[in-house]
Amino acid sequence: GLGDVYKRQVYGLTELNQDKIKSARLIAVPGCYPTASLLGVLPLLNKGVQIESILIDAKSGISGAGRKAVENGLSVEINENFKAYGIQGHRHLPEITEIVELVSGYPISINFLPHLIPAMRGIYSTIYVQLKDLENLDFQNLYDSYYTDSPNVRIMNSEEVPDIKSIANTNNCNISVNKSNIENQVIVISSIDNLVKGAAGQAVECYNLMYGFNQSTGLDNG
């Protein structure tokens, strides 16, 4: 039945489940918003840091709405425009919440609000993580260490800020992490191409791992 199928699937976020993907036969490839959001918070979830809440302010290029929406005039509607949607709930929030709580091991209050921006492609997530205590953590080192073996994730230094132009048409994710001016809060910015790292590119990564190829085969950015 469907329940058995669900139990057999492996969540296809390579930065989280690389070993499980290698032996899997059924992969659930993450959505574009969950990919950017989860890559932004994963290093904080299993380091003994107590997270009180996560606020994800996410923006997407119009291709995220699908080809039909673009052909039906969305590109004209959003030109020189900017708007939120899914305010009452978005289908990707349960996916984000499930993985965050699975990795952290405890319930975390998560608020997620997506927006459409006047660009064709790209996901840009600004993530506010409220911690119980910063505990003098070196966040730059924490993120660098977590993603040291992840070929498609780049942790930027504190003087740099991700954008969507630099990751367009690539399978990369750029991340910055900084302390907020609010006590015990961290601001993480994560950017990906919704059509590559947020979709087809990630599926290729999973295929490569399942069949013994290098994770980045066919995805190298020339």
Stretch-by-stretch model annotation:
Residues 7-96:
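Rossmann-fold dinucleotide-binding core
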Residues 21, 164-222:
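C-terminal helical cap and adjacent loop that interface with cofactors, partners, or active-site loops
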Residues 2-6:
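Short, small-residue-biased leader/transition segments that mark boundaries at the very start
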Residues 51-61, 141, 213-222:
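Short alpha-helical "patches" and their helix-cap loops
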Residues 52-53, 62-188:
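C-terminal substrate-binding/catalytic lobe of Rossmann-fold NAD(P)-dependent oxidoreductases
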Residues 38-45, 93-97, 140, 144, ...:
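Predominant activation on well-ordered alpha-helical scaffold segments within soluble catalytic domains
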Residues 32, 131, 194:
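Residue-level signal for short, function-critical loop segments
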Residues 36-37, 135, 198-199:
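Secondary-structure boundary/capping motif
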